[in-house]
Amino acid sequence: MSDAIKVGFVPLSAAARGILVVFCDDGLKLGPATAKALGGATELVKRAASAAAFKGKSGAALDILAPEGVKATRLIVIGAGKATGLKANDFLKFGGVAAGKLSATAAAMTIMAELPDGAMTSEQAVAIAAGLRLRAYKFDRYKTKKKDGEEGGSRADISLAVGDVAAAKKAFASAGHVVDGVIIARDLVNEPPNVLFPEEFARRASLLRKLGVKVEVLDVKAMDKLGMGALLGVGQGSTRPSRTVIMRWDGGKKGEAPVAFVGKGVCFDTGGISIKPAGSMEDMKGDMGGAACVVGLMHALAARKAKANVVGAIGLVENMPDGNAQRPGDIVTSMSGQTIEIINTDAEGRLVLADVLWYVAKKTKPKFMVDLATLTGAIVVALGTEHAGMFSNNDELADRLLTAGIESGEKVWRLPLGPEYDKLIDSQFADMKNTGGRHGGSITAAQFLQRFVDGTPWAHLDIAGTAMGAPKTDINQSWGSGYGVRLLDRLVADHYERK
C-alpha cells in the first residue's frame, strides 16, 4: 500500500509551497490569515471570480495563476458556501476537490485550513487530509506504460496550514488508519481474479496478525468437518480451494461479547452452471467487495487500537462451471442443519454467507452481526449507487447504521423483512430454496440470510451498487470504492468502544 501524496501539518503562518489552496464563503470572504497571505492579491481574486462566474458555492473551485507577490505556482480558491453548519463530509469533499487539482508533475501543495471566521478545527482539517488521500488513490500496478508527465513516481508533498499542529497530527494518526483500511479494501476489489483467488485472499487477510489481530484460516477439510455444505457447494467447481477466515481484535474489556462483521468473498463469479452473460462478466472480480470491506475494517480498528472486541469473518470461494460444479436441483446441507435446494447457481453469495453467519453466531456469541455482500442486482435497480440496501431484525442496530451512514457519507436505506416473504423461498424438496424469483429479489435474499443468524441481532447490507463500478466522486476515482469501512468504523467508534 502506497500513497501518491504525503500529507503533513504546518502552522497557519508557514510560507506556501507549490500550489496554494484557500477557502472562501459565498460572499468571497477569506479568513484573516488567508487574506494576510494573499496581501494585495485579494482584489485580483475577486476580479478572477467575477470573470469565471465563481460564486463560492460549496465544493466549487477557482483555479488561477498565482498573482505577483504570492509565493505559489498556482492559486486555487475552494468555495465553502455559507461556511456555517458544515459537516465532516463537506471537509472530506474539500480535500478531494483539492487533490483533484494536483497535476501529475506537481511537487507540493499548501492548503490554508481556514474559513472566514478563523482557523478550522483539528477535526475539520483532518477530514480534508483524509479526503486528499482518498481522492489521490489510484490502482495502476499492472500498467507498464505511464501517460505523459507521470514518469518518475515521486509523491506530492501536501501541507495543511492549521491553527494547532499538534492536535491535527494526533487526530490524523487515528483517521489515517481508517483511510488505510479503505485503501486496502479498494486494492482487494481492484485486483484481477487470477491474482486474488481464495488462498491468496486468505494470505493477505493473515497479514493483519502484524497488528495484533488473531487470524484463523479454515481450509476445505476443516469446513467439511464443521458441515459447511452450503459454502463448499459453491466452490466445488473451481480448482481454487475455498477458505473461511476468522479475524479477532480484542481491544475491549476481557470476556465481553464481541461485535461481528461478515463479508461475502466470491473472488470470481461466473454464475456457475447458471452461467452469466459474457458482457461485463469481468466485473465479477469485485464480487468479494463485502469481504474486502471486512478486511479493511479490521485493519482500521486494529491499527487505531479500537477499544472494542471485534470479530471479522469472510467466506472465500470461486463460483466456476466444471464437471464437478454444483447443479440446479442439487440439495445441500448447511452448517445449521437446514437443507437448501439450489434453483440457480448464480444465487451463490447467500449460500456462502449462510454458513459463515451461522459459524459466527454459534462460535463467538456476538452482540450483533452485520454482513456485507454484493448480493443482488435488484438492489441496484431499487437504490442505484447512492445507498446500500439495509435489512435488519433489530431496530436499534438499524437506526445506528442509518446514522453512521449519514455521518460517514456511506449511506444506507432500510428495506423490509417479513414472514409474508417466506413463501417465496419455500421448496418442495428441501427446507428452502436459494432464490425466490424476480419479485422482491433483494428482500427474499435477506429473508434467506435471516434464517442463519440464530436470533442474533443482525443487519444485512447489500452493497452491489456501492462497492464497485459506482460513478466517480470527489473522494473516489477508483472502480473499487472501499465502501463500508468508514461506515462501520463510525458505528463501532460511536456506540461500541469502551470510554
UniProtKB/Swiss-Prot annotation:
- Top-level enzyme category: hydrolase
Q: Which GO terms describe its cellular component?
A: cytoplasm
Set out the biological process GO terms recorded for this chain's protein. Answer: proteolysis
This entry's comment on the bound cofactor is: Binds 2 manganese ions per subunit.
Principal subcellular localization? cytoplasm
Q: Which reaction does it catalyse?
A: Release of an N-terminal amino acid, Xaa-|-Yaa-, in which Xaa is preferably Leu, but may be other amino acids including Pro although not Arg or Lys, and Yaa may be Pro. Amino acid amides and methyl esters are also readily hydrolyzed, but rates on arylamides are exceedingly low; Release of an N-terminal amino acid, preferentially leucine, but not glutamic or aspartic acids
Compartmental location:
Cytoplasm
Query: CDD domains given for it?
Result: Peptidase_M17 (cd00433)
**Might you give the EC number(s) for this enzyme?**
3.4.11.1, 3.4.11.10
Keyword vocabulary terms for this entry? Aminopeptidase, Cytoplasm, Hydrolase, Manganese, Metal-binding, Protease
Q: Where does Mn(2+) 2 bind?
A: 264, 269, 287, 348
Q: Which cysteines are joined by disulfide bonds?
A: none
Q: State its role.
A: Presumably involved in the processing and regular turnover of intracellular proteins. Catalyzes the removal of unsubstituted N-terminal amino acids from various peptides.
Q: What is this protein called?
A: Probable cytosol aminopeptidase
Q: Which organism is it from?
A: Bradyrhizobium diazoefficiens (strain JCM 10833 / BCRC 13528 / IAM 13628 / NBRC 14792 / USDA 110)
Recorded name of the encoding gene:
pepA
